[in-house]
């Protein structure tokens, strides 16, 4: 019985991290699904979101407004607003002027934007780690004790609930709303949507904004879960989320969700079996294994290019 608790604990830990990977991965997959390009500055948008949350919580604490609901609301609201503005700006500056040229040019532009944002944060906030309060300490224990049961922290429960609500809301938006249908139309045939009178530039900008907002939600949740942030967290989080998007099928929103969860679980069990230093090896090994047998990802669809 203790063995079952141990594996269930790893599953819970993996799903916690994986759900946040999924939120970030959706930003990659939505942009790729419409313009066929990867936003390599997306990880830095996530990093900026965590710093905005830190600043919001710190300012409220300095003013004596230390109510947990107020701090959480301020952290989410400020982070989403600021990162959405960054997402829109990245599309306007790094992608839109270069979209009609060689596909490598926007890629290089995005990498340059990523380096610029990371160094801008280093200069403004310094490179030292900063602590974000958890705000929701404590946990539930399912079983006889914490040593012989499954421990789920309040923060993990918050991560599950918020992630589920955000993904459910996004699914409804994409499937039911007029803008969501326009996003799907652009993903199917960008040129045809322009002929039908849909402003594809606005839809593309909207996907960058949505992706940035989802990254902000993940940034606040993971920041409070781990309690520490630094200017370098965006790089690894971005690579992991991109891996999740490719694993599930880049361009597929359900694929990004599934890929994030699978990647998180693979990391958790990989760290448990081989040691924490090998969790990245297991995660990327899983990606290679899936791509060997299904190059389009688990839920990806093969694309036929007309010549």
UniProtKB/Swiss-Prot annotation:
UniProt main location, coarse: membrane
Keyword Transport set for record: yes
Compartments (UniProt record): Cell inner membrane
Cellular compartments per GO CC: plasma membrane
Residue ranges of the TM segments: 21-41, 45-65, 70-90, 104-124, 132-152, 154-174, 203-223, 224-244, 245-265, 280-300
Keywords: Amino-acid transport, Cell inner membrane, Cell membrane, Membrane, Transmembrane, Transmembrane helix, Transport
PANTHER family assigned: BRANCHED-CHAIN AMINO ACID TRANSPORT SYSTEM PERMEASE PROTEIN LIVH, HIGH-AFFINITY BRANCHED-CHAIN AMINO ACID TRANSPORT SYSTEM PERMEASE PROTEIN LIVH
Protein name, per record: High-affinity branched-chain amino acid transport system permease protein BraD
The organism of origin for this protein: Pseudomonas aeruginosa (strain ATCC 15692 / DSM 22644 / CIP 104116 / JCM 14847 / LMG 12228 / 1C / PRS 101 / PAO1)
